[in-house]
Amino acid sequence: YTLLILASVYYLMNNRTWMGMWFYGAAFAVKLQTLFIFPFLVILWVRKKVDLKHFITIPVMYFVGILPAWIAGRPFKELIGIYAFQGGKDRWSLSIKFPNIYQIIGNNFFLDEYVKAGMLLILGILMLVMCYMAYQKVRITKEFVILLVVFFGMLTTYFIPHMHERYLYLTDAFLLIYTLIRVRRFPLFVTASFLTVVGYGQYLTKQAPLVSYGALAFIQLALLVLISLDVYRYLHDPANVLEGGTLESDRIESERTEGRAGL
């Protein structure tokens, strides 16, 4: 599913919106965790890089994905709700070898209360962040798209309950791309990879890591803060502000870019 997301972002960055959204829909049909970075599509929609009609690809590709199982005899109602069923399987822990906020506050107590509070918290944070970004009239460059994927991938997984150690795989892939653009940020990728390897190591060796997950969660928080600062700097860099500061000027700039690319 990471390969599908990479293809999706590639086509979206090159203004081939339908192709990009078909790949995103295919990724969603494969893996629910595709939703971790869904807010970046909302930002592209606000900036008129994606239209509402393009989002039809998500349910269409999901239906295509469940069609073989339906034909084979599995109940359609069960197939439609399979992601909801999967989301309720890990109720025994708030964080499964994942360095996020629940490793700091304790991931084995008040499970139901923290799950509800955590979901409300991340929804509130995402709404505030997306509203703030929507009012910033900046150019949607390829670098910014990559940065958005990394940012939302880190943000959502840090606050959503029941995260597994493998759920940062997608973010790590895009973080590598981002650090190849911003070489001075390469230590962030090295650090993020270390955190991922710690979780994998415990799974493979069945032994607890030498460093507590609480300490690792603070390191992950530091990475999130640094990436957030990169987003803030981009939004407030005068070089990235649109001429006229309107969505219309963003559309004109996009048309110019498409014209130069021959799309």
Task: Tell where the protein language model's regions lie, with residue ranges.
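Multi-pass, polyprenyl lipid-linked donor-dependent membrane glycosyltransferases
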Residues: 1-6, 30, 167-168
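Aromatic-enriched
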Residues: 185-252, 263
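Specific aromatic-rich, kink-prone transmembrane helix
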Residues: 1-17, 174-175
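Perimembrane helix-loop-helix junctions
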Residues: 36-60, 71
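Aromatic-anchored segments of alpha-helical transmembrane domains
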Residues: 62-68, 151-159, 191-205
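Aromatic-rich transmembrane-lumenal/periplasmic boundary elements in polytopic membrane proteins
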Residues: 54-100, 104
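Membrane-interface alpha helices of multi-pass inner-membrane proteins
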Residues: 7-11, 18-43, 151-159
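Aromatic/glycine/proline-enriched transmembrane-helix motif characteristic
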Residues: 84-158, 232-235, 245
